[in-house]
């Protein structure tokens, strides 16, 4: 009799343990959307917004309201888009933030964040995080384009001299990055010519073979689009 009671208790304990595990797994799955992840974002990575601010953005959009919130510095930030895997924020009057939830494999997602500053020409910073907001090496998920990839290969000595001369005025490598809302692509626009005077900007632009590059998420990393 005592042995049967002990066995029943063990069965009850195992069922409760299984239920707790299932609930925990369910919560983890629910947290794999950008709204939940954004709210859980550490304050150290979110100097403009409190946790309440971050929750308000999503709640306002879900209620079909303008998601405009006064930030810690007394200015307004506005969330423009929010889906399960994409977020677009007008952080300040001169900066934006994008996030994209991307699959590394069937069970692991990471967050790609693109912060773009218009000062006055757009330039972006890309970072990657796991879903616990631990920063990950950028090189693990993308090899950023070299500046030279945007330029034509000179075919004559005169073209080489002209390119060398005009690039003296292009002393900053400025690159605007943008995540796609619906796809899993990352585009780069070469913005260096935009901060130069018109004459040198036109000269530099004539030496470019492209101003935009597209990368696609493939095999757990961003790679140049085929």
What are these regions (language model features)?
Residues 1-37:
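Bacterial Sec-dependent N-terminal signal peptides
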Residues 138-215, 223-226:
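Short aromatic loop motif centered on NTY/YTY
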């Amino acid at each position: 009799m005592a042995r049967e009671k002990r066995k029943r208790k063990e069965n009850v304990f195992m069922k409760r343990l299984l239920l707790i595990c299932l609930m925990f797994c369910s919560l983890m799955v629910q947290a794999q959307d950008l709204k939940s992840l954004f709210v859980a974002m550490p304050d150290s990575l979110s100097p403009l917004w409190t946790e309440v601010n971050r929750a308000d953005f999503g709640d306002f959009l879900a209620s079909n309201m303008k998601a405009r919130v006064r930030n810690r510095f007394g200015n307004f930030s506005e969330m423009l888009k929010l889906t399960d895997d994409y977020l677009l924020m007008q952080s300040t009057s001169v900066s934006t933030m994008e996030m994209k939830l991307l699959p590394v494999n069937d069970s692991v997602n990471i967050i790609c964040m693109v912060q773009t500053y218009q000062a006055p020409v757009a330039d972006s910073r890309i970072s990657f995080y796991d879903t616990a907001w631990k920063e990950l090496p950028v090189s693990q998920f993308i090899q950023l384009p070299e500046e030279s990839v945007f330029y034509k290969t000179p075919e004559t000595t005169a073209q080489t001299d002209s390119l060398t001369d005009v690039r003296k005025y292009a002393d900053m490598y400025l690159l605007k990055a943008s995540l796609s809302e619906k796809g899993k692509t990352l585009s780069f626009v070469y913005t260096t010519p935009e901060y130069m005077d018109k004459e040198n900007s036109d000269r530099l632009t004539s030496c470019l073979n492209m101003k935009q590059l597209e990368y696609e998420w493939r095999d757990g990393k961003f790679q140049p689009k085929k």
